[in-house]
Swiss-Prot record:
Its EC number is 3.1.11.6. The keyword Cytoplasm applies. This is Exodeoxyribonuclease 7 small subunit. It is found in: Cytoplasm. Pfam families: Exonuc_VII_S (PF02609). GO terms for molecular function: exodeoxyribonuclease VII activity. The lineage of its organism: Bacteria, Bacillati, Bacillota, Clostridia, Eubacteriales. Signal peptide: none annotated. Bidirectionally degrades single-stranded DNA into large acid-insoluble oligonucleotides, which are then degraded further into small acid-soluble oligonucleotides. Heterooligomer composed of large and small subunits. Belongs to the XseB family. It is an enzyme of class 3 (hydrolase).
Length: 73
């Protein structure tokens, strides 16, 4: 799979879902689109996991100083 941005991969995944939900694809094409959708889904999940690991938030502690804490979803 080519190197995609998260946003482009998500858009392509949404398009794949729409194609599959339309019911207009032949069986072989449906399987191909489904496989591509799985790859896109895994890519998006990986990108989100990596982003989650990088996110930190800044909070003010009781002493009035700022500290970095891991972001929790």
């Amino acid at each position: 799979m080519e190197k995609l941005s998260f946003e482009l991969a998500l858009k392509k995944l949404e398009e794949s879902v729409e194609q599959l939900e339309s019911g207009e694809l032949e069986l072989e094409e449906s399987i191909k689109v489904f496989e591509q959708g799985i790859e896109l889904s895994l890519f998006c999940r990986k990108e989100l996991s990596q982003a989650e690991g990088k996110i930190q938030r800044l909070v003010k502690n009781l002493g009035g100083e700022f500290e970095l804490l891991d972001f929790e979803v």
